[in-house]
Amino acid sequence: LHDALPILFPAGRLDKTSTGFVLLTDDGALAHDILSPAHHVEKQYVVTLDTPLTDAMRRGFAAGVTLTDGETMAPAGVEPLTDDGLTVQVTLRQGVYHQIKRMFGVFDAGVNALHRESIGGVALDPALAPGQWRELTAAEVERLQNVK
């Protein structure tokens, strides 16, 4: 039975405290293209902070945050989703270990929740409960294949 199953490649991962869209594919080249920093595939997240979004955070994300270890992240988008600035949308085109948490950490802001909403313009299906999955539509596959 194991030999009859397709080999699946994850196109990104989430840590155990994050939720949302995880893309698994049997197309290794597609997974590589989505993950490759050279392709700058956009990923969007809804993030709940322990302190409101500030103008300094917005400017820092737009310019590219330099982490405490000296590594500078690519510019990223951050926009408030709530009036209190505690829930924000973050748009990344790069994927580094705990990137969002580390970027907000530079501004002494903690991340209480992190939820990936989309990858390469393909949004998480709101009808899916946590742990559920579905196959991509032909249009979604085409969109991902054209992100290069």
Protein language model features and the residues they cover:
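RNA pseudouridine synthases
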Residues: 1-148
